[in-house]
């Protein structure tokens, strides 16, 4: 904190510089050291995980193939919204008042998505969800529009503006047309959103993301999702009048699954040192690493709901046919988590090894 002296010559602290409302977006160096996740970024992650919990709430009553089919696309949209903002802020976050405001408004829009998610796939109730998601994407477009002036980044920002902007228009249009045309527009818009980063991959080499900060953001999001799984175990135990052996064993195994995921992902993530993206091949691997977190996150949420259901039913063994479906799905979800984590970590390790070899050759 800066210091000054008063009339008596005593030192006193003074506040730091105020955030200027119109500070332009700036390119965050991929070699920047000491960068940490900000409190706003952590708040942003918490809001998104709360939205995921809201979207997953119907799974507690319909843990079936149909329930999973309905949950997965809605989760994919929330995950895509989180990823879009996270990748942008990793590159261009200026932490000015406008950037903070756009981030907070995105959090509000995601909350609106979650509020409309319960019947989002019904023909009568999907317009509000589509309009909220369109608003999220338009806010992301506004952020990239602010970053268009950054030297060397215009080819990248232009492609993101065109891709995400076109998808946002389709999302808005979908809220105005009836089903089933509305859902076909969803598919087209989501495909454009997913394809945009891949079409800009060669330009991302010139404007690489911070290869230390972005893994930290993904790691924190994964950690908060794991925390929600632990909350599910607690809710399952809370529903019991006492602690019957079956419920206690199920809760212990559920906590063990969460701990196994944590160990597998974070111990490996810490072992693999992050390196900047220098070539197109490394940029592609970095994109694959990022997208590998989708099955990882999806599996954590689905297995967490499954563990809660098993703990709740274990006391009386009143599992039923739907409950019998819970156990294999939970196991498959856990395997998806572990495979996603393994893919993510192996790609990161290969990037690190390639960067180390290149450094040795240069030296």
Task: Annotate each language-model stretch with its function.
Residues 181-185, 325-335:
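Loop-to-transmembrane alpha-helix initiation sites
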Residues 15-38, 42, 47-53, 62, ...:
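Predominantly late transmembrane helices and immediately cytosolic-facing juxtamembrane segments
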């Amino acid at each position: 904190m800066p210091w000054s002296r008063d009339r008596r010559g005593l030192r006193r602290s003074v506040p730091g510089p105020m955030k200027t409302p119109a500070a332009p977006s700036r390119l965050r160096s991929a070699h920047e050291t000491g960068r940490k996740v900000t409190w706003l970024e952590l708040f942003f992650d918490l809001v998104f995980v709360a939205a995921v919990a809201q979207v997953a709430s119907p799974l507690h009553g319909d843990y079936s193939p149909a329930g999973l089919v309905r949950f997965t696309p809605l989760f994919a949209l929330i995950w895509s919204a989180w990823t879009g903002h996270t990748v942008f802020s990793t590159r261009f976050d200026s932490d000015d008042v406008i950037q903070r405001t756009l981030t907070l408004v995105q959090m509000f829009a995601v909350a609106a998505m979650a509020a409309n998610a319960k019947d989002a796939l019904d023909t009568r109730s999907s317009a509000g969800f589509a309009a909220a998601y369109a608003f999220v994407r338009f806010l992301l477009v506004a952020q990239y529009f602010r970053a268009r002036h950054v030297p060397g980044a215009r080819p990248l920002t232009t492609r993101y503006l065109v891709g995400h902007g076109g998808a946002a228009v389709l999302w808005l249009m979908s809220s105005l047309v009836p089903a089933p045309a509305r859902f076909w527009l969803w598919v087209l818009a989501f495909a454009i959103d997913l394809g945009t980063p891949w079409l800009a991959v060669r330009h991302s080499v010139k404007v690489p993301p911070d290869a230390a900060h972005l893994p930290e953001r993904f790691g924190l999001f994964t950690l908060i999702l794991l925390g929600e799984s632990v909350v599910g175990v607690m809710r399952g135990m809370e529903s019991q009048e006492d602690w019957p052996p079956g419920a206690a064993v199920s809760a212990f195994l559920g906590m063990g699954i969460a701990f196994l995921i944590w160990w597998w992902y974070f111990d490996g993530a810490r072992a693999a040192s992050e390196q900047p993206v220098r070539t197109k091949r490394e940029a592609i691997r970095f994109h694959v690493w990022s997208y590998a977190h989708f099955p990882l996150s999806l599996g954590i949420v689905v297995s967490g709901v499954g563990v809660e259901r098993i703990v709740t039913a274990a006391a009386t063994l009143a599992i039923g046919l739907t409950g019998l479906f819970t156990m294999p799905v939970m196991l498959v979800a856990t395997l998806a988590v572990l495979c996603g984590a393994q893919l993510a970590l192996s790609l990161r390790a290969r990037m690190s090894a390639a960067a180390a070899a290149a450094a040795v050759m240069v030296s």
